[in-house]
């Protein structure tokens, strides 16, 4: 129960700070909300996957902290790359469709290989005999995978739907 209250406390501090920074960086609430969407998707999906794993193997409760921290951090990080590239492509005169495709081809590749590097590194913790580290390997790999998928699938889809409204209020 303490872990859950710690996670909630951390999120109550981290999310408002992240919103302030994202609004400052992106200049609009709409654009600032997209990285939080990616982070939230990564966290929720990872909780579900880890819950499934917990039915078959021991999982450290501390892996939930890893999921929330990495999920929010990577969701924001990867989204910054993708959104900035999409905005650049729109500023260069590409249509919304063209900008989305070009963004996934370029920034999507960067996010994919960055995530692959982090995921493989975290997965290597699974080779240690301690359950604590093995559960971190599963949780870490999962949340990185979900953040990457969110950034290269869900985020471009959201930007495609929003179009130039992403800059509304700028």
Q: Regions from the language model: what does each represent?
A:
Residues 1-170:
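Membrane-embedded transmembrane helical bundles of large multi-pass transporters/channels
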């Amino acid at each position: 129960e303490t872990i859950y209250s710690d996670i909630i406390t951390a999120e109550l501090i981290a999310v408002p700070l992240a919103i302030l920074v994202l609004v400052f960086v992106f200049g609009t609430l709409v654009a600032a909300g997209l990285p939080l969407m990616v982070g939230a998707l990564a966290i929720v999906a990872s909780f579900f996957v880890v819950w499934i794993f917990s039915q078959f193997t021991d999982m450290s409760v501390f892996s939930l902290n890893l999921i929330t921290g990495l999920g929010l951090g990577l969701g924001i990080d990867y989204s910054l790359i993708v959104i900035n590239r999409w905005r650049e492509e729109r500023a260069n005169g590409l249509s919304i469709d063209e900008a989305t495709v070009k963004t996934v081809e370029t920034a999507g590749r960067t996010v994919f290989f960055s995530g692959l590097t982090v995921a493989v590194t975290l997965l290597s913790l699974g080779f240690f005999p301690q359950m604590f580290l093995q559960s971190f390997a599963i949780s870490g790999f999962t949340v990185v995978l979900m953040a990457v998928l969110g950034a290269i699938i869900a985020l471009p889809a959201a930007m495609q739907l929003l179009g130039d409204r992403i800059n509304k209020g700028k």
